[in-house]
Amino acid sequence: MRIDVSLLPALAATFMLVFARIGAMVMLMPGFGESNIPVRVKLAIALLLTLIILPLHRAAYHVDMTSMTSLLVLMLHEIVIGIVLGATARVTLSALSVAGSVIAQQLGLGFVTSVDPTQGQQGLLIGNFLTILGLTLLFATDSHHLVIAALNESYRIFSPGEVMSTGDVAALATRAFAAAFKIGMQLSAPFLVFGLVFNIGLGVLARLMPQMQVYFVGVPLSIMVGFLIFALVITAMMGTYLNYFVGVMHDLTPLR
């Protein structure tokens, strides 16, 4: 069996192009692109996915080995596609951060912070808890496979070398951010209702009993009742989030 070594440069260039798209996406993917995960692990995951995707979509790449400029432009195009896909998946986590921020404010815990492992910075405690719980459920339910499936489908929508429509990208970003904020508010809706009713009740109590220190009674009572509500609705909240994530992944690629 003879191997035509003249094909190796083109194959190597195709490998690097596929790796550019997948690597950019992995660096932003929920669960894989966290700041506390070593870069070598991220690169290993991207390399493994590249070895899987390359045989499936090698024919989609038409590499011109005579022009380094066109090769670099094509690689930049692949990186941008990977960033768009990864950032869209990453935005889904912001829904939990929005919900956590609203819940913390309604329970009087807006001052309680901790390190957010997904962002590498300080964040509200409840928001961090919901984010970690959401990531755990994504892996426990194999929903992260949908991100990989979206990556595979992206070759049908964003063909290598084809000029990306800025309108499609803008529409994708707008829908992603709007949906994340909407879901975040829906997840925190029970606590918004609780906060409204509770604060009205405290206001009435303060007018009826002016000598009573309402603040010292209201804060611990708000936290206690709020956590009771949190325990009752957490299952429904995370179920809603998982359905939202699955819907985003299914709608990620069919833009046109």
Model-derived segments and their meaning:
Residues 1-256:
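Hydrophobic alpha-helical segments and their helix-loop boundaries in membrane
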